[in-house]
């Protein structure tokens, strides 16, 4: 924040980032405040780069937010230009670890990169070594959740058929085969649906219901080898979004935050409409995770981005039902 008062470019880009974030949350577009600060940030960034042979941390932060804005507004060409420019700036300054702001800048760039990878079904540009990292012990966004004692999971409402279903999702993520070809329609087995033979889970409340819809999306895509953004997953993701909108504000325990992150990144990968709404909603939650949780999140989201991209490459062979 201190840098924003000392650097006009940073001042405008922070106000631009805040205004554009509110636009995404509210489903708005074309706010004059957003565009004013965006124009000023671009103008000042261009002047800074032209006037100096070096690139400052505030210049890099400005380019980062410009990339984030274009990515969150699905402006793919503009986002790619800013991303490539940012990558050149970071490399010219010695890489992410050499950036200032006590590590905050490199942390933000990495997180924004993960979000961009999920939205665009592509490899994360930052935060990996030689592209994708393949941990010795594969980790998914569900790993840390399901490793908790059953007593803790049960106290949060994760039990019975729902818990079995989440384990099924986790196992399928760990054993994902990129050579899987698009197959027939998959339907949740009756034993997984427990007391819900018609697939009606709403009576369990929005949190558990959201987990049911997310699990359906995962297994439908993983077992059939089709993209997360396939047409038949759109009904589930719209219901997932409705559940998230109905979450109680006091549902903010450590476990609940991790599940919320999993749900929102699922929605961002799946939705054809309101894709970026999911990332805008989850951003503050990701920033509130502990260092241990963040480490697990980063490993899990890298694996998820890999699967999202591999399944997207199957789109040409997607089976219509």
Predicted features by range, described:
Residues 39-45, 49-50, 93, 186-321:
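Fungal-biased detection of long, low-complexity, Ser/Thr-
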Residues 15-25, 38-76, 87-92, 109-116, ...:
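Hydrophobic/aromatic-rich effector regions of fungal transcription factors
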Residues 1-11:
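Acidic, Ser/Thr/Pro-rich intrinsically disordered transcriptional activation regions
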Residues 10, 34-37, 58, 79-82, ...:
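Alpha-helical interaction elements in eukaryotic regulators
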Residues 11-17, 30, 34:
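Alpha-helical solenoid scaffolds in large eukaryotic transport, assembly, and signaling factors
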Residues 27-35, 76-79, 230-233, 295:
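Flexible, glycine- and charge-enriched loops at secondary-structure boundaries
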Residues 23-28, 222-224:
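Boundary/linker elements of alpha-helical solenoid repeat scaffolds
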Residues 75-243:
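Central/C-terminal regulatory/activation regions of fungal transcription factors
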């Amino acid at each position: 924040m201190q840098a924003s008062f000392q650097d006009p470019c940073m001042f405008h880009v922070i106000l631009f980032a805040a205004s554009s974030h509110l636009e995404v949350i509210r489903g708005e577009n074309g706010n004059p405040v957003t565009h004013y600060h965006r124009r000023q940030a671009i103008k000042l960034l261009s002047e800074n780069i032209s006037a100096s042979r070096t690139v400052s941390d505030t210049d890099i932060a400005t380019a980062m937010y410009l990339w984030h804005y274009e990515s969150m507004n699905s402006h793919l060409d503009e986002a790619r230009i800013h991303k490539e420019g940012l990558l050149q700036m970071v490399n010219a300054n010695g890489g992410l670890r050499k950036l200032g702001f006590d590590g905050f800048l490199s942390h933000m760039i990495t997180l924004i990169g993960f979000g961009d990878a999920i939205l665009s079904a592509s490899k994360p540009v930052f935060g990996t070594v030689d592209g994708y990292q393949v941990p010795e012990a594969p980790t998914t966004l569900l790993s840390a959740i399901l490793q908790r004692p059953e007593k803790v999971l049960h106290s949060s409402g994760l039990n019975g058929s729902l818990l079995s279903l989440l384990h099924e999702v986790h196992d399928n993520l760990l054993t994902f085969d990129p050579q899987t070809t698009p197959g027939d329609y998959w339907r949740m087995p009756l034993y997984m649906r427990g007391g819900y033979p018609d697939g009606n889970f709403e009576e369990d409340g929005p949190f558990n219901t959201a987990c049911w819809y997310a699990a359906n999306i995962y297994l439908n895509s993983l077992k059939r080898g089709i993209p997360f953004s396939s047409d038949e997953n759109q009904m589930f993701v719209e219901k997932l979004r409705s559940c998230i909108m109905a979450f109680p504000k006091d549902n903010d325990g450590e476990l609940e935050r991790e599940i919320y992150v999993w749900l929102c990144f699922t929605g961002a990968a799946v939705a054809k409409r309101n894709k970026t709404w999911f990332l805008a909603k989850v951003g503050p939650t990701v920033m509130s995770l502990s260092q241990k949780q963040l480490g697990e999140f980063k490993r899990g989201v890298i694996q998820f981005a890999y699967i999202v991209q591999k399944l997207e490459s199957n789109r040409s062979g997607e089976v219509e039902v």
